[in-house]
Amino acid sequence: MARVKRGVVARARHKKVLKQAKGYYGARSRVYRVAFQAVTKAGQYAYRDRRAKKRTFRQLWIARINAASRQNGLSYSRFISGLKKTSVEIDRKILADIAVYDQVAFAALVEKAKEGLAAA
């Protein structure tokens, strides 16, 4: 039977993992066994947190919108309800941006929401 030489493949795989672990502390960046565990765990954290990031940012936007709408005399839930009744379709990301960078425009949106609530 022919001899199987696969050192090249193993070396390449090890190099790939160690390259991914570059910048890690101590054995995590030098020893393949430890580096493999560290890289795998880092991948799991990255996968989880890409999803968590969406939730975190939505929370931030809602907090900003709530603060700005309360300054204009309306709670967050009533503000969103009023916007829906007046069929203003601006998502929370943009609303939060408007709340932070353009208070005059946001105040106009709050007035629009108040009109929608009064009409209903």
Curated annotation (Swiss-Prot):
One of its GO terms (biological process) is translation. SUPFAM superfamilies: Ribosomal protein L20. Keywords: Ribonucleoprotein, Ribosomal protein, RNA-binding, rRNA-binding. CDD domains: Ribosomal_L20. Pfam families: Ribosomal_L20. GO terms for molecular function: rRNA binding; structural constituent of ribosome. Coiled coil: none annotated. Gene3D superfamilies: 6.10.160.10, Ribosomal protein L20. GO terms for cellular component: ribonucleoprotein complex; ribosome. Signal peptide: none annotated. InterPro entries: Ribosomal_bL20 (IPR005813), RIBOSOMAL_L20_CS (IPR049946), Ribosomal_protein_bL20_C (IPR035566). Belongs to the bacterial ribosomal protein bL20 family. Binds directly to 23S ribosomal RNA and is necessary for the in vitro assembly process of the 50S ribosomal subunit. It is not involved in the protein synthesizing functions of that subunit. This is Large ribosomal subunit protein bL20. It comes from Pseudoalteromonas translucida (strain TAC 125). The gene is rplT.
